[in-house]
Amino acid sequence: MLKALFGDPNTRKLNKFQSLVTETNLLEEEIKKLSDEELKRKTDEFREELEKASNDRELEEILDEILPEAFALVREASLRVLGMRHFDVQLMGGIVLHKGQIAEMKTGEGKTLVSTLPAYLNGLTGKGVHIVTVNDYLARRDAEWMGQVHRFLGLSVGLIQSGMSPEDRKKNYACDITYTTNSELGFDYLRDNMATSMAEVVQRPFNFCVIDEVDSILIDEARTPLIISGPIDRPTEKYIQASQIAKQLVKQEVEDGPGDYEVDEKARNILLTDEGYKKAEQLLGVKDLFDQDNPWAHYIFNAIKAKELFTKDVNYIVRGGEVVIVDEFTGRVLAGRRWSDGLHQAIEAKERVEIQQETQTLATITYQNFFLLYPKLSGMTGTAKTEETELEKVYNLQVTIIPTNRPSQRYDLPDAVYKAERGKWMAVAEEVEELHQKGRPILVGTTSVEKSELLSNLLRQKEIPHNLLNARPENVERESEIVAQAGRKGAVTIATNMAGRGTDIILGGNSDYMSRLKIREYLMPKLVKPEEDELAVNVPSLGGKRSRPQGFASDKKVKTWKASPDIFPTELSEETVKALKEAVKIAVDQHGQQSLGELEAEEKIAIASENAPTDDIVIQKLREVYKKIRAEYEIFTSKEHNEVVELGGLHVMGTERHESRRIDNQLRGRAGRQGDPGSTRFFLSLEDNLLKIFGGDRVARLMDALQVEEDMPIESGMLTRSLEGAQKKVETYYYDIRKQVFEYDEVMNNQRKAIYAERRRVLEGLDLKEQVLQYAEKTMDEIVEAYVNPDLPPEEWDLNTLVSKVKEFVYLLQDVAPSDIEDMTFMEMKNFLHEEVRKAYEVKEQEVDRVRPGLMRDAERFFILQQIDTLWREHLQGMESLRESIGLRGYGQKDPLIEYKQEGYEMFLEMMIDIRRNVVYSLFQFKPQGQPQAV
């Protein structure tokens, strides 16, 4: 009804922005006439204009005014440097991002190029722009590729990668535009708030952030806290014993039936029954699992969770004797990440690998609260509309759908649902075989490593050649190579969740990528230092045979850089091979044999494959030969492109509905990019997880009613509705969990902001002395309030204890006696002690500074930071325990969240009091050595 009256809100928004696009287009001819130097001069003119702003509001207004000209400038620079011109819909996307909204753009519509527009415009302010991607590879690719446009226009471009030194991080964060990943950004923030001097702080205050694959980070990752932890000692034998006990405990199959524990798959939790408690206590030979001196409950719960809820090759893989988490959304391994609260150790005990030390949280924040620290936030994704409510409620981000540049020609075929899982997989293999014979490229999405290997075995039996892309290390190495060829005629690719895989699937094959791969093959062995080959490892494959990971020699840990020969559509002509060898020789003459790091050499190839102006002779030669190779490959790929289009384009097959419709849409979006033809179909079974957990009894009843063979597809409106309903239920369920996480974390967030602001003030050394004096005065006030009740007559005041308490904190006040204060009022006592403590502090300062001038300031900084860090760490644990126990309050008709807020606030106030008192006590007790020394 409202839509009919007012029109679609998305269309209204787009119409509003259309005038800016028109204005940008009108400037195109004028900007085209400018020389390279004149284009660069425009950047200085814009900066001068922005300097006139006296506050943030005026700055935003000027940015809005110069937007059309700045966008026209970026469009022209991009055309000159990369050979890529922004379409009108990409300009529209850029406007949406600059306005601090989310731009939903379909796969293949050039999201990466869109980000150059708001990044340049906001980068002009000099306050820093962060472009955030999901992994190091994409951050590096975009910094090298899109960064050329910014560098050409005179802005500095930084890149943050894991393993980088603090000095390099600081330098890269100081750039106008910095490319990084969400985890590096979050961990740097936490580390900065654990720094002991300003020299260790690497980030500047946050300004503007553009998140690529925004839904993946703000929604899928929202429940994942970033944690920096330190080791704590817990006996590893307890994990092993608990794992053995868990094996002997039996799962309860029906509600209130026999069994030792019940499993709540929805909440991913387990509950011991009364029998379970008794049995576990009996097997352990203890009276109580919750005994404070010898607690076992924590270990037993985790061991059962490890047994029932965490499956090998689905939730994790075992690699090199370590349990490595697999990200359920991207299908990638999360190297270096561990489950907390002893869960990882329980899984290590289950898999019989070495149990690593448990850790204690030192600093933590969720992505939800981290990204809310930015004054202006925006993001891009192919799929955000389904989560619009959450993005708007939690992050205050509107979603705008950007139309595609060409109309979509993708056909989404109806789901094929099978009664049993076996029937489903047979049908998938048959459809692959049928389409493969016609020569259509096929992409099959699976939800786990285990399922992808099951299908791979079926296809092997049918002798269908295929590529496998999942979290196993031997496959990860070839990721871009596999995706780049997934659109070739007859190609079959099996991939675990396609989220965040940054290479486009181009019908007929990606000639640009093939050409770069060929140059890499010749150039890298001659140019790269051998010790750079950190990735060169051999990994045992399935079946005990040792497979050779792509690009590695079979017996030595040395990279060969050779891609598999079937990647290339044709052999190169002799003339081109000769030119390639000459270009490599020039590179070696210029840089020396095996002299460059891997990243430097990769960067040379990346720049050579673009059109950025360069004086580097090596890049010029590589560019000439790149164009020759590409021209030869393109003869074949363009012919193949037309053949594949004739056949109907890429066919995408889903093999299970994901918990989120968005992830399904991401998979579908791989077909029919940029107006190409394509089709998609989902193959499902009534035994799939989603239907088992959320489909409920309706589906079970339907199964019994349908007397069909397991290999016959069922098509039923009720079933499709059940599926849609199940997915919506899951989405709502997880949204509620995320909302709850957010509400609880909001309490921690306010405390975190307060403690980090206090810490930063101390680091910057602002009025440290005054701060400590205020701490001391407040402590004196608290002592007076504890021993003097103004409502009672003075003879009942406990002045002796009061005075001895004062001396306990400040030994320099030994001369103060009860008689000094007995005739004073409550307020007079406070004022008297304020004066005394200030005098005592002056004496202390002179005493300390005699050892080394300025030592007192260092001591103040050291003691305040030490107390903040130690007590904040304990507070984090206290809040975690409070949160675990607070859920039980719900049974007592109290709102757990309100209780948590109240008690959490009281705990925080107590911590602040302890920090204050401990600092005062430590500083007055501090006795530096006789010679100069640093604290």
Curated annotation (Swiss-Prot):
InterPro entries: Helicase_ATP-bd (IPR014001), Helicase_C-like (IPR001650), P-loop_NTPase (IPR027417), SecA (IPR000185), SecA_CS (IPR020937), SecA_DEAD (IPR011115), SecA_motor_DEAD (IPR014018), SecA_preprotein_X-link_dom (IPR011130). SUPFAM superfamilies: Helical scaffold and wing domains of SecA (SSF81886), P-loop containing nucleoside triphosphate hydrolases (SSF52540), Pre-protein crosslinking domain of SecA (SSF81767). Gene3D superfamilies: Helical scaffold and wing domains of SecA, P-loop containing nucleotide triphosphate hydrolases, SecA, preprotein cross-linking domain. It is a peripheral membrane protein. The keyword Cytoplasm applies. GO terms for biological process: intracellular protein transmembrane transport; protein import; protein targeting; protein transport by the Sec complex. It is found in: Cell inner membrane; Cellular thylakoid membrane; Cytoplasm. One of its GO terms (molecular function) is protein-exporting ATPase activity. The keyword Translocase applies. ATP binds at Q90, G108, E109, G110, K111, T112, D504. Its EC number is 7.4.2.8. GO terms for cellular component: cell envelope Sec protein transport complex; cytosol; plasma membrane-derived thylakoid membrane. Part of the Sec protein translocase complex. Interacts with the SecYEG preprotein conducting channel. Has a central role in coupling the hydrolysis of ATP to the transfer of proteins into and across the cell membrane, serving as an ATP-driven molecular motor driving the stepwise translocation of polypeptide chains across the membrane. HAMAP family: SecA. Belongs to the SecA family. This is Protein translocase subunit SecA. It comes from Gloeothece citriformis (strain PCC 7424) (Cyanothece sp. (strain PCC 7424)). The gene is secA.
